[in-house]
């Protein structure tokens, strides 16, 4: 499974990237706005840091302008994936941009029907939003499972990029089901290391070392 980090914070990306935890990055205008910097400037800096795909989102809602924005975004770096919404115009833009040879991440997916359309339109990634489905008492993981089954049935190459990840359990369940990629905030990825028994065991270990006055350096 590939790990994408969902942020525009340069320091957070660098920390995880240094550990080999970053296979890509997802951004959106809201995340970049928090940084207080220019969208092109921030995206270019992220692309220089990370070898994998960096999703940069269009701001338009009509196909023609989405295509124009997408073509401008891919000029930033060769690892840009143009992020478009799962609307009819978004699918039109996806088809054109993918035919041009560019990576496209179709976002805001909430149904298997939508995911099927995105794959047919040539999407590189489909981003089903798990947490937002859970928020309205629907099963986000069931959607991941349905998409996995459909894509496997017909050999679609579109990668399932599980998004709106709220917890480490979302990551684990996505891995069990077979999502190709997850994208999560840095804090959620870092929380994967935590377990109370690890903390308890380390405390006991350190107490034993102190009692025995063991030193290596």
Curated annotation (Swiss-Prot):
It comes from the Bacteria. It catalyses: D-sedoheptulose 7-phosphate + D-glyceraldehyde 3-phosphate = D-erythrose 4-phosphate + beta-D-fructose 6-phosphate. GO terms for cellular component: cytoplasm. Pathway: Carbohydrate degradation; pentose phosphate pathway; D-glyceraldehyde 3-phosphate and beta-D-fructose 6-phosphate from D-ribose 5-phosphate and D-xylulose 5-phosphate (non-oxidative stage): step 2/3. It is an enzyme of class 2 (transferase). It is found in: Cytoplasm. The keyword Oxidoreductase does not apply. Keywords: Cytoplasm, Pentose shunt, Schiff base, Transferase. InterPro entries: Aldolase_TIM, TAL/FSA, Transaldolase_3B, Transaldolase_3B/F6P_aldolase, Transaldolase_AS, TSA/FSA_arc/bac. Disulfide bonds: none annotated. GO terms for biological process: carbohydrate metabolic process; pentose-phosphate shunt. GO terms for molecular function: aldehyde-lyase activity; transaldolase activity. SUPFAM superfamilies: Aldolase (SSF51569). The keyword Calcium does not apply. Its EC number is 2.2.1.2. Belongs to the transaldolase family. Type 3B subfamily. PANTHER family: FRUCTOSE-6-PHOSPHATE ALDOLASE 1-RELATED (PTHR10683:SF40), TRANSALDOLASE (PTHR10683). Transaldolase is important for the balance of metabolites in the pentose-phosphate pathway. This is Probable transaldolase.
